[in-house]
Amino acid sequence: DMGKERLYLKPESFYHENKIKLRLGLTVKKINRIKKLIETDSVTYDYDQLILTTGSLPNQFPGNFGKNLSGIYYIRNLDDADKLKEIFEPGKTALILGGGYIGLEGAAVARLKDLNVIVVEKSKRILNRVACEQTSNYFRKLHQDNNVKIVEGYGVDRFTHQNGKINGVF
């Protein structure tokens, strides 16, 4: 297992040394571009240069499509990924919906933990929205060489379940 620090683009000291003030996990309520002020729930900040890195939310299944079933996890950050360490059991199967960078990284970690892994990507190829075809081909081969099954061009319509646990995917 590698430490979380190795996953960050820069160490925390980089930001301090370069006089960059990080404000993480805040909800910005208002930006005044004329006065160069940012208003959050509790504090107002002034700024010289503003860089918005808003992150994103994972695609969620609509309605009751699996929301109350055990075994469905959404991953968007390191804390989400850490929670999976507890449930990864060698020999179990991980079905990963989404063949972007986060999904492929999850697949790699699951294989390192000796899980059987299937990645389902609804686009025509993995990394379709973020990389060229050659990059997709490289990562497809890398994952397949490490026994990850990749299914492209198919989405998931529904789960079947019994006693609150998934027992089929269509």
Describe each PLM feature range.
Residues D1, K67-G71, K113, S136:
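Glycine-rich, phosphate-binding/catalytic loops in enzymes
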Residues D1-Y8:
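Glycine-rich phosphate-binding loop and adjoining beta1-alpha1-beta2 segment
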Residues Y8-L95, R158, G168-F170:
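FAD-binding core/adjacent interface of flavoenzyme oxidoreductases
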Residues S13, A108, R140-K141:
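Alpha-helical segments flanking ligand/cofactor-binding loops in enzyme cores
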Residues H16-N18, R111, Q144:
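Short polybasic/polar patches that bind polyanions
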Residues R23-E39, Y45, K113-F170:
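A Rossmann-like FAD-binding core segment of flavoenzymes
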Residues K83-A131:
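Rossmann-like NAD(P)H-binding beta-loop-alpha module
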